[in-house]
Amino acid sequence: MALPIILCLAVILWTSWRLLDALFLSPLHRVPGPVLARLTPLRAIYARLPSRVIPAALADFHSYGDIYLSKPRTITISHPRDVRAILASSEFQKIDVYHGLNDPVMANIVTFSDPKLASRRRRQIGPYFNPSYLAKMEELILRCGCRAVADKWGRLIAQQGHGPQKSVKVNYRHDLQLATFDIMSALAFGRWLDSLKEEGESVAIVEWIMATAVYIGVRINFRLLMVFPFSRLVRRWTRAYAEFVQFSKHAVASRKELLAQGCQKPVDLLQAFIDAEDPDSKVKMTTVEVQAESVGMQLAGSETTAASLTWAVHLFTLYPEYYRIAVDEVRGQFGPNHLITYADCSRLVFLEAFVYEMLRYTPITSSFMPRVSFTKGTTLQGHYIPPGTEIAFNLIAMNNREDVWEEPERFLPDRFLKDPDLKRSVFAFSYGTRSCIGRHLAWMEMMTILANLLKDYDWSLPEDSLYGPHHVDEKGIPIRMPSKCHIVFAPTHPDRDCQLVISRPKT
């Protein structure tokens, strides 16, 4: 009987100490937040479930404000001033959420927590993501992106079009996803798969990438699932990731073999990574590091852009008045046979404003990688935040602040035409020197694909579409199709909700 009593007392004492520390002794005890978040990370894990992300983020913001405790030793902030201060400070580094993977292929500029490694890698590959170098790759980007989608839609109209306008139904989520995956495969692995003509291997790559995203999420948030026998539940994702790693390894080896044979260097990201050199230390990237960056670009650069384009098309279908403005702008500037380049897109001011509002209204992710300083504390919203405290960011709340955005619940692209400075408050690509290294590439893809498809085709919703301008909430605002978030926000039912009727413009 003595042992159970001792164990019981130990549990009571431990629980009492945790409560005392969390509620009264911790340096963070005055920071607002729910009691449960002070004791366990379980509440935060529940809030990250794919269908819970948006409502949980908004509920916490409305309940606790600009700063709150989201789990033990972790605060979440949402005031733009605080977010800029943390992201701009060299004292605060990304937390090492990938340390449990023990996988060198996951060690890339997206995942680095060591500021020195991240800075060196940015010096090595950063010049290749500048607009001037991207312009050298634009022909490839246009061929794999807007031209590939337009060609497929044209073939479908020729083969299956019906009615006076020869209209046909397409799944824009599927086609835009394949296009962006093709772009990154061509750039990062030197392999253009022509997925929109012959899906074949590209379908496997899409499955690899989607499975890898789930696999990484499980490894970070639910590590117990990686232990036998629970690991059997995620075995198919583990296998898919292993196949993806082998694909990337083969791509790098094939390119180096071609170079050894004296072949001309292609202009793409794979070659850029092979040639990359730190101007300070003169250090080049190893074969595994090249592989890691190629994998990172495919993972971070394809699905994010595909999701952005998906939401842009969806919002055009919800707001036909904005669709008509964009169409008139594009077709008023360019003839039907003109291939719109990224330089041309500087003339499309409404379309750019529309994309900015899309990034605010339907953010692609819910946050950035949390930051931490192990040497320096800081003060946020009047609360001292000691060293070692993780700082997370509530991007959903930042995009819905009434002190920044007039009527944030409404989709209003004109706000960026009236006040261009609002663009600084869109944090879709993070902020400052640590902003997304591929942001210029993402903008090039989004603008050229949208502009050319708006020029070449008329869009409309199928008659049986569940979501459109007719399906509104109590405020008269069109309801968006449901989404879920693993790494990015994507439609929950893409086969049902991402159908579009297209036809050639009337002449």
UniProtKB/Swiss-Prot annotation:
Main EC class the enzyme belongs to: oxidoreductase
Pathway where it operates: Mycotoxin biosynthesis
The entry's keywords: Heme, Iron, Metal-binding, Monooxygenase, Oxidoreductase, Signal
PROSITE patterns, per database record: CYTOCHROME_P450
GO process annotations (BP): helvolic acid biosynthetic process; secondary metabolic process
Cofactor(s) listed: heme
Expression induction or repression: Expression is under the control of the secondary metabolism regulator laeA. Expression is completely abrogated when gliT is deleted in cells exposed to exogenous gliotoxin.
Alphabetized InterPro entries for the sequence: Cyt_P450, Cyt_P450_CS, Cyt_P450_E_grp-I, Cyt_P450_sf, Cytochrome_P450_monoxygenase
Descriptive protein name: Cytochrome P450 monooxygenase helB2
